[in-house]
């Protein structure tokens, strides 16, 4: 192993000669060569495409009378870990797919412990939020990968089987290097055209991969139609509402009935306040009689959660969303609303600290949540009612730092929900007002 490393250092640290063309372009590759003391010639033919791909074809010409073994290898070095915010939904660090298994190692993990794996196929690299540098070893060659830290972060591979080159024999090996911005179409194109196993996972789609990726393609489709990602987000919100319209319709009808039944429920609670068991029985009888599901009102919230996180993920990790403007003051949908209610949205010449940046769109979102809440039945428990009343303000503060595109999605979704809910309540109220609610049996 030591002798092998010495040979590697000998090859790597030599001065190479450029043969012929000395300018690397997509139409003109370059050739580097070097001959060692044993009369073995090493040639590197380096070519690039018109985007991010480098191909390094390494040829060894053995002009000696002996047989030698060589171990092709490649290495990516990062001197320092970047300054990153520790988001739980995004991986930045060392990455690879080995025999179809994704491996993600954070910088701090590698500082503490080396990672090694043997594989028959795959790729390895170092990734940031929007950028990746990756190595793709030659196909059908087994290799070992090491992620380690020795004053520098290193992602490297070395073939585990020697390439034997006899006297007067020539052999070649090709390594692909991709130094890319993580644009979805480009990454997918390399994965398909170069047959790179699961290279699309270079973009951190996350746990909701099955939902996030199709959602991105749909948003991107609407963007190509409208020319604005903000409008695309609004259209995707409408599509989601349409898909789940029947389920939301059922839920809102049940909530509307609950609101109409609220006086009767209050009366029952007052009547049976000393007998919890009897109260429960009477309540269940009332629900059964009027065909009301008391928990169905939670369905719209549960429906929103996966799509909320999926859109957040799309906004957060896809390069296509970066620096995409909406209308007015929103210049980047992947960033928070830059305005603040505490300086009257820019009318007062004062820059509030970041935790006070509660902008126009978060305020609109909070207002839409408050108005939607007014359409729901009031909780009979006073403490619960106060908590619910405080909830829109709480979420406004919590979601204010989130990407403005996500806040726009939430606001439009609330408005559409209110419209649907309002119509259903109006229709259901008239219908239920004709229902006679029988008196409960008194004890």
What are these regions (language model features)?
Residues 5-8, 12-198:
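Soluble non-transmembrane domains of integral membrane proteins
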